[in-house]
Amino acid sequence: MNCACVDIGTNTTRLLVAERDDGRLREVVAVRRFLRLVPDAGGQIPPDAVAALAAIVAAHARMAQQYGVSDVHVVGTAAIRAASNRDELCAAVHSACGIPVEILSGEQEAELAFTGALATLATPPAGAIGVIDVGGGSCELVTGTVADGVTWWRSMPIGSGTLAARHLRSDPPELAELAEARAEIDVALEGVDPPATELVLAVGGSATTLAAAGGGELEPASIARILAVLLAEPAAEAAKRLGLHVERVRLLPAGLLALEAAWGAFGQAPLQVARGGLREGVVMRAFGGRS
């Protein structure tokens, strides 16, 4: 039996159709559409973005149904949590596809990211595991174990889209703008002290893009190397060089800064990109897994 999740993020709206295989998830299809949900001065997502989002979610739901899915879960994260017109937005999506939108709290987002990260590991370690989820609107840090689930978490408003909108005004970003973004990240992480872990799993677009663009290397030097490329030329040129979507490239410097700082909060324990994250966690929950 297949199950599907549509994840409405700050930068992208993603569909995952998956099946459960011996307690693990197997991806059937995954699709993403870039759509920035940027609030206006009054905190509202503009009407044109709401209409575009409703159309995207409806298209994702139709695709899921083509794969035999009747159980489609639509979830919203930081951008919708913070929007002053979230009720109208959710109503528009519901009207377009007939599926209610579940607005996740920061705690739920952290728990589901942890569940999803573990769901795609062939052999999860028995000891403490950390998870870093750098999204578009927020960043979650989580620790826990396979046996006990989440034992500690924090959610902070330092997602890649949020940081880029506030600080990265130039193309390519200037060093002074990166310093501004890093200063905000440092303030958000002040006093954040995760329990010790033997492994840290990174989920979210910034992490997977780093792994792809960096040739799979996950170390501080790989972050610095990719940042150097992103600062050397406009986003359109860097996108061609790295083989990435230009909108992803525009947000990547901020996401990498947040990932690097969050990794530092864990003492830079070994870092591995996990194939699963929030969407996989939602599907696991639907299948009767943790969270």
Outline where the language-model segments fall.
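Flexible N-lobe loop architecture of eukaryotic-like protein kinase catalytic domains
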Residues: S70
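N-terminal basic/disordered segments at the start of proteins
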Residues: M1-R26
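Broad gene-expression machinery/nucleic-acid interaction feature
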Residues: T12, A30-R32, I129, G136-S138, ...
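N-terminal glycine-rich anion-binding loops that anchor highly charged ligand groups
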Residues: R24-R32, Y67
